[in-house]
Regions:
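Short, conserved catalytic or adaptor-binding loops enriched in Gly and charged residues
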Residues: 32-36, 120-128, 186-189
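A generic beta-sheet turn/junction motif
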Residues: 36, 201-203
Length: 203
C-alpha cells in the first residue's frame, strides 16, 4: 500500500485539516478511523495478476462504500463485479465510486457506463442510478500555478487531441500510435533513393 501512504492518505489528511476535523480522525498507514462514530476508511490494493488480493477484498464485511481510484487501470471487469457484489449492507445506502481519467473507448468502463447507457463525454447528472461527475483543471484554475497553466496552453496549441484527452477528460477513439497522424501527401521519392517494399501481416 505504498501508493496510498504516499498519495491518498496525505491528501486525505490535508483535506480534514482544512475542514478542521483533525481531532475526529485517527490515521495510520492503511486505515482511517472516525473517532466519533467508529466508522473505518480502509485502503487496499487490487492485484489484477493474482486472485488472492481480490479474494481478500471480497471477504470484507460491513463495507458500504467502495472508492476505486485510477479505475481505468483495472482491466478485468470481472474483478470489479466480484467486489461490487460484496457491497451489500442492509438498511444503509451503498455506494460504488469510480475515479478515473478517460482512456480509450475499448475500455470496459466506457463500454459499460457510457456507451452502454448513452452517456456523452462530459455529462454531469444521474442516469439509471449512476451519478456522473465530470471535472477538469478548468474547475480548479485558481489553485494551479502559472507555469502549469502555461504548459497546458502549449499542449492545447501543439497537440489538441492530447489536450482534449489528458486535460479535458475526453475518451480516445483508439490507442495513440495505432495510426499515423499529422501526415500529408507529397511527391514520392524526390531524391530518387533506392526503394524497398515490405508487408506487415498484422500478427
Amino acid at each position: 500500500m505504498t501508493s496510498a501512504r504516499l498519495s491518498i492518505i496525505p491528501e486525505f489528511l490535508e483535506k480534514i485539516s482544512l475542514l478542521g476535523y483533525d481531532n475526529i480522525f485517527s490515521v495510520n498507514k492503511s486505515e482511517v478511523v472516525n473517532l466519533k462514530n467508529k466508522s473505518d476508511i480502509l485502503f487496499r490494493g487490487i492485484k489484477t495478476s493474482a486472485g488472492n488480493q481480490t479474494a481478500s477484498l471480497k471477504s470484507l464485511t460491513g463495507v458500504s462504500n467502495w472508492v476505486l481510484d485510477e479505475a481505468e487501470e483495472l482491466i478485468d471487469e470481472n474483478i470489479f463485479d466480484t467486489i461490487d457484489l460484496s457491497i451489500r449492507e442492509k438498511n444503509i445506502q451503498n455506494r460504488i465510486i469510480l475515479v478515473l481519467n478517460p482512456v480509450t473507448k475499448d475500455n470496459w468502463i466506457y463500454e459499460r457506463f457510457f456507451e452502454g447507457k448513452g452517456i456523452e463525454a462530459g455529462f454531469n447528472g444521474v442516469k439509471d442510478n449512476v451519478c456522473y461527475i465530470h471535472s477538469t483543471y478548468l474547475d480548479n484554475k485558481e489553485n494551479l500555478s502559472e507555469s502549469f497553466l502555461e504548459r497546458v496552453e502549449a499542449i492545447k496549441h501543439n497537440n489538441y487531441k492530447k489536450y482534449a484527452q489528458k486535460l479535458l477528460g475526453q475518451w480516445l477513439d483508439r490507442a495513440e500510435g495505432v495510426v499515423f497522424e499529422s501526415w500529408s501527401i507529397g511527391e514520392f521519392n524526390p531524391d530518387d533513393l533506392q526503394t524497398s517494399c515490405g508487408m506487415d501481416f498484422g500478427f
